[in-house]
Structure formats: C-alpha cells, structure tokens
C-alpha cells in the first residue's frame, strides 16, 4: 500500500510512472539497483558482495548494488529514482512528493500556494509518525507487550482525532480539494487495516 500513494497520484496527476517491485516475501529474490531485476539462487552466490544481512524489518538477506546504497543510504524500500542523474529518493511520502511535483495537476501538492503546500507537508509528517508507531507494533506482533499495544493505540487515536478535527472544517484533509495528504492517508490507513487481519 505505501507504493500505492505514488501510483494513485501519478494516475490522478496525468503522468506515467514506472514501478518495479514484488511482495515483501520475494524481496530477497531481487537485485536492487536503478534497473532492479529478479535473481535466482544461482545468481545470489555470484552476488555475495551485494548481500546485506537483516538488521530490522526483514529476515534473511537482500541484494543491493553499491550504486543503490549510495543513492539510498538507509537501504530501505520503497526507493525511487528521479531525473537523468538518477537521484535516489526514499521514504514513501518523499517519493509521493516527487511524483506530485511532476504531475500535470499541480493542485495535488498545493499548486502555487506555498502555505497550502506546507500544510500538506504537515499532514504527511503526521502520517509518518503514526506509521512508525504502527510499524513497531507489527514487528513485535508475535510477542507484543502491553506497553507497545497502549502506545500504538494512543498514536492511532491521536492521529484520527486530528484528522477528524480537520475534516470537520473542510471537505478534504488539508483544505477544500483533494491533495496528496488525502491520498497518503487513504494508503496508510489501508495498510493499517490490511495488516490488522494477519
């Protein structure tokens, strides 16, 4: 669902977007680079120099080229590249912003109104705070503590109360028209609901 943010924005904004990826369980079966590609077990033995062992958020190994990690120093996905220079962009909301800037429909990211753009950014940042709490919850799900449960519950309630307050004053989250703040929320909430079933 996090990559959906950029896909939906590109569709609404009238631009083409190339997305390469796979399901989380298949991530170790790819060589991550600007031109990411699937790899076989045989390939993996030849790509040992690109192997990155699990640190957090996944188990096993992933394979990422030096060029990938230069552009994405945290080594996370989703990961985007933009421009002829193939500049690396990481974090789903940053990729979302980059896509929105390229869209024909500039209103998705506030248009010429820099104050609205800043307001949209505020909601995107609040989104990430909630997402971070939820990710910790998911990673501990098999051995959840009462502390983590209560912290996630409080973050969820705080986040939704803020959105409800905003929506009581306007038709959309950041104002009176659809923006990437709405798209980001819908995708993050879909992730939350989806993961809640497992």
What are these regions (language model features)?
Residues 100-104, 128, 168, 188-189, ...:
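Hydrophobic/aromatic-lined pockets within catalytic cores
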Residues 105, 165-177:
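Surface-exposed helix-capping loop/turn segments at secondary-structure junctions
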Residues 173-198:
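GST superfamily/GST-like fold recognition
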């Amino acid at each position: 669902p996090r990559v959906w943010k950029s896909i939906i924005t590109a569709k609404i904004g009238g631009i083409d977007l190339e997305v390469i990826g796979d399901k989380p369980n298949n991530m170790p079966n790819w060589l991550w680079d600007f031109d990411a590609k699937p790899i076989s077990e045989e390939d993996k033995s030849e790509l040992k120099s690109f192997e990155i062992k699990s640190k957090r958020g996944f188990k096993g190994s992933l394979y990422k080229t030096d060029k990938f990690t230069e552009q994405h120093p945290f080594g996370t996905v989703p990961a985007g590249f933009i421009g002829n220079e193939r500049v690396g962009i990481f974090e789903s909301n940053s990729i979302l912003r980059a896509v929105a800037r390229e869209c024909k429909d500039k209103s998705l990211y506030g248009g010429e109104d820099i104050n609205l753009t800043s307001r949209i950014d505020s909601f995107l940042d609040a989104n990430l705070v909630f997402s971070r709490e939820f990710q910790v919850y998911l990673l501990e799900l098999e051995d959840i503590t009462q502390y983590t449960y209560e912290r996630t519950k409080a973050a969820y309630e705080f986040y939704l109360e803020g959105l409800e307050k905003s929506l009581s004053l306007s038709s959309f989250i950041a104002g009176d028209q659809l923006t990437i703040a709405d798209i980001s929320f819908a995708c993050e909430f879909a992730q939350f609901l989806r993961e809640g079933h497992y």
